[in-house]
């Protein structure tokens, strides 16, 4: 707000803004008698602090170098600038009058605590009565409250890595957190607005209180696998035909199968691939018979822990029969009735591509025998 005000004054030809400069930064003298420039506000993350210093010094880094935190600060700066331009246009007197009101009438309360954990607790309480925080914000605060001071830097870096990776991939952090909990802890029904209360009640089960940094490492490992799965790759980033086929069928909107894949990500690849193929077949049966994919929100969490305990294909067969195959059999009669009269123009583009690819593969197998089990398109 202050940087935008100062820069708006300058854009209107005003050069007298020493009072604003003094609020933004201060000059200090070090032990060698040298004057040093210090921004008054010290941000938690280095990248955000770098941008704030750039705003104060009028040396903003190139946009291509911005992180998500830096972009958020610039969005706030641009919003403030747009407000000044809209409300006061070129009227310097009115603009200065607003600044006078802001500085002299708006009171900022500074709360000092004896520890960061206590500060975070107060922050959580204040925001419970004001700005709403989602489960990710609250979880971050909770982890810092549980961590030793020596862990703060490690925790800060790990958390930023997690959130940035999800945002950079266009993935909603809350959805990932919900799917992670459903996949890992045997929960079968949990809404996004229930995540934080669930975590508080299950501290011992999850283990974040005893090892906050370790829990963030686990989240990062799961998020890396999750994002690779969304791209049709194995959790170590390698091409995976069975996963690619599922993702081609699922498109960008359907993600419930990620609950299963997160739960079984450490199984032997033969078992993991078999689960992928069964998930693909069930999804296709749902597509042909017009079933709502939201049913997977019920089925997959219910199956996740059972599937995660399987180590061999032999052990998987009876489980597959009582889960995926059982549900497919329930749809069998309708599937055989609907598939012959299915219209391609009734499908979305990505579903059309999937269907054509699978039909082409079936023709190749019928005409030439064994074909490559690689890509299905």
Task: Describe the function of each predicted region.
Residues 1, 373-377:
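Histidine-centered nuclease catalytic patch
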Residues 1-2, 194:
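Conserved long hydrophobic alpha-helices within structured protein cores
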Residues 2-189:
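Glycine- and hydrophobic-rich flexible loops that cap the catalytic core of alpha/beta enzyme folds
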Residues 7-12, 129-133, 267-271, 289, ...:
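Secondary-structure transition/capping motifs at alpha-helix termini
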Residues 89, 107, 128, 136-360:
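A cross-family structural signal marking well-folded subdomains
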Residues 95-98, 108-110, 245-251, 369-374:
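Generic recognition of flexible, low-complexity loop/linker segments
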Residues 364-365:
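Short, compositionally biased pre-sequence/patch detector
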């Amino acid at each position: 707000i202050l940087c935008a005000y100062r820069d708006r004054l300058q854009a209107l030809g005003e050069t007298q803004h020493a009072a604003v400069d003094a609020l933004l930064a201060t000059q200090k003298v070090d032990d060698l008698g040298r004057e040093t420039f210090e921004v008054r506000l010290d941000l938690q993350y280095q990248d955000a602090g770098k941008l704030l210093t750039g705003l104060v010094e009028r040396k903003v880094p190139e946009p291509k170098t911005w992180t998500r935190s830096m972009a958020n600060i610039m969005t706030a700066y641009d919003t403030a600038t747009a407000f000044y331009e809209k409300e006061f246009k070129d009227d310097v007197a009115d603009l200065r009058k607003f600044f006078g009101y802001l500085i002299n009438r708006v009171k900022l309360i500074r709360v000092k605590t004896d520890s960061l954990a206590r500060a975070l607790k107060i922050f959580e309480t204040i925001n419970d009565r004001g700005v709403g925080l989602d489960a990710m914000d609250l979880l971050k605060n909770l982890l810092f409250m549980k961590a030793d001071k020596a862990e703060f830097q490690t925790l800060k870096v790990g958390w930023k890595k997690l959130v940035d990776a999800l945002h950079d991939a266009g993935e909603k952090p809350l959805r990932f957190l919900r799917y992670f909990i459903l996949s890992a802890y045997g929960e079968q029904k949990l809404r996004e607005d229930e995540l934080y209360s669930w975590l508080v009640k299950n501290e011992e089960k999850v283990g974040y209180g005893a090892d906050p940094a370790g829990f963030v490492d686990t989240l990062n490992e799961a998020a890396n696998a999750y994002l690779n799965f969304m791209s049709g790759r194995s959790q170590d980033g390698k091409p995976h035909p069975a996963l690619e086929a599922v993702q081609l069928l699922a498109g960008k909107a359907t993600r419930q199968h990620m609950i299963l894949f997160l739960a079984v990500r450490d199984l032997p690849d033969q078992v993991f691939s078999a689960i992928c193929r069964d998930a693909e077949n069930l999804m296709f049966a749902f597509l042909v018979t017009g079933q709502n994919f939201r049913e997977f929100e019920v089925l997959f969490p219910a199956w996740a822990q059972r599937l995660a305990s399987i180590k061999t294909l032999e052990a998987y067969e009876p489980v597959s029969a009582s889960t995926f195959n059982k549900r497919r059999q329930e749809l069998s009669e309708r599937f055989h009735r609907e598939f012959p009269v299915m219209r391609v123009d009734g499908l979305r583009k990505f579903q059309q591509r999937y269907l054509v690819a699978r039909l082409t593969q079936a023709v190749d197998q019928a005409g030439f025998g064994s074909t490559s089990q690689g890509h299905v398109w």
